[in-house]
């Protein structure tokens, strides 16, 4: 299924990093904080001065957006204004 965000919104896929304690214990999903890194999967109508595009990795406000499932994968539809930074590698 293809989802195209409307307005100044993005469809992002959270980047889940496996969390371990200092002792090497892997934490279950319920004990982890919500991720704040994601990859942009689809873009809506972005402002002209916006420097984001599909494939960019970003840091976003962890309590923003609407979580959705597409083909058993987790995604978030988020406003462009809730993107805090672009990760440049």
Swiss-Prot record:
One of its GO terms (biological process) is chaperone cofactor-dependent protein refolding. It holds the Pfam family Cpn10. The keyword Cytoplasm applies. One of its GO terms (molecular function) is protein folding chaperone. Keywords: Chaperone, Cytoplasm. Transmembrane segments: none annotated. InterPro entries: Chaperonin_GroES, Chaperonin_GroES_sf, Chaprnonin_Cpn10_CS, GroES-like_sf. It is found in: Cytoplasm. The keyword Cytoplasm applies. One of its GO terms (cellular component) is cytoplasm. HAMAP family: CH10 (MF_00580). Together with the chaperonin GroEL, plays an essential role in assisting protein folding. The GroEL-GroES system forms a nano-cage that allows encapsulation of the non-native substrate proteins and provides a physical environment optimized to promote and accelerate protein folding. GroES binds to the apical surface of the GroEL ring, thereby capping the opening of the GroEL channel. Heptamer of 7 subunits arranged in a ring. Interacts with the chaperonin GroEL. Belongs to the GroES chaperonin family. NCBIfam families: PRK00364.2-2 (NF001531), PRK14533.1 (NF011106). This is Co-chaperonin GroES.
